[in-house]
Amino acid sequence: MSTTAKIDFETGLFDEGQYEEAPDLPAIQPKRRTSRAPFIVAGGLLLGVVSENGN
């Protein structure tokens, strides 16, 4: 008994001759520079809590 399955694709599903036009994408905004200080403080506090619980 063969375990392979035959898959019937819809006609036109993979037509390579027709391409849809890509939608106009908005201009890419430059990333805002976020301050790292809050993350550094939070990371330091987290390390402090973890090291206190480890002892």
Swiss-Prot record:
Keywords: Plasmid. It comes from the Bacteria. This is Uncharacterized 5.9 kDa protein in mobE 3'region. It comes from Acidithiobacillus ferrooxidans. The lineage of its organism: Bacteria, Pseudomonadati, Pseudomonadota, Acidithiobacillia, Acidithiobacillales.
